[in-house]
Amino acid sequence: MPLPLFASEGGFGLNLNLFETNLINLVIVIGVLYWFLKGFLGGILERRRQAILKDLEDSEGRLRQATTDLARAQEDLAAAQQKAEKIRSDGKARAEAIRKDGEMRTINAMAAVKQDALADLNAEGARLTEQLRREAALAAIDKVMTELPGRLDQAGQSRLIDASISNLEDA
């Protein structure tokens, strides 16, 4: 009985003859390729896998080192910022101390100038007062000397001389 599915009929069909379909040849070729390429490609893939693993381990090591370096750098930065802040605050304190010292020196210098001026003024006042006293005394003596001979008699002159001597003895 003829099978309508055979290729000899002119249509599409399934050829069950193993030798005509090269199925055995394909199985052999695929098997040989699998066996040959398994070792060859397996070695290549294994070497590639090892290289990738090594690169990953190196990358992880560099990442750990970079993380450590970053942490150290951040600590150094924080320390540097603290030091800079301390220097800045010390500078401000020093500037304030210098300013206050300058103010105190200026105040003291002004006080000294004022004291000197006051002392000069007092000395000049004392000198002028003394000069005025002398001039007043000389004027009074001149006036008395001109008027005295006409006003005093011999007894009055004696009393005046005795009173003057007694005043000189008390002083």
UniProtKB/Swiss-Prot annotation:
Self-association or partners: how does it assemble?
Answer: F-type ATPases have 2 components, F(1) - the catalytic core - and F(0) - the membrane proton channel. F(1) has five subunits: alpha(3), beta(3), gamma(1), delta(1), epsilon(1). F(0) has four main subunits: a(1), b(1), b'(1) and c(10-14). The alpha and beta chains form an alternating ring which encloses part of the gamma chain. F(1) is attached to F(0) by a central stalk formed by the gamma and epsilon chains, while a peripheral stalk is formed by the delta, b and b' chains.
- Specify whether DNA damage is a keyword of the entry: no
Q: Please tell me the species this chain comes from.
A: Synechococcus sp. (strain WH7803)
Q: GO cellular-component terms in the record?
A: plasma membrane-derived thylakoid membrane; proton-transporting ATP synthase complex
Give the transmembrane ranges.
Answer: 24-44
Put simply, this protein is called ATP synthase subunit b
Q: Which superkingdom does the taxonomy of this entry point to? A: Bacteria
Q: Which HAMAP family match?
A: ATP_synth_b_bprime
According to its UniProt entry, what is the function of this protein?
F(1)F(0) ATP synthase produces ATP from ADP in the presence of a proton or sodium gradient. F-type ATPases consist of two structural domains, F(1) containing the extramembraneous catalytic core and F(0) containing the membrane proton channel, linked together by a central stalk and a peripheral stalk. During catalysis, ATP synthesis in the catalytic domain of F(1) is coupled via a rotary mechanism of the central stalk subunits to proton translocation. Component of the F(0) channel, it forms part of the peripheral stalk, linking F(1) to F(0).
Q: Alphabetically list the UniProt keywords.
A: ATP synthesis, CF(0), Hydrogen ion transport, Ion transport, Membrane, Thylakoid, Transmembrane, Transmembrane helix, Transport
How does the protein associate with the membrane? Single-pass membrane protein
Keyword Transmembrane helix (UniProt): yes
GO molecular function, one example?
proton-transporting ATP synthase activity, rotational mechanism
**Gene for this protein?**
atpF
User: Main location per UniProt?
Assistant: membrane
Its subcellular locations are: Cellular thylakoid membrane
The similarity comment for this entry is:
Belongs to the ATPase B chain family.
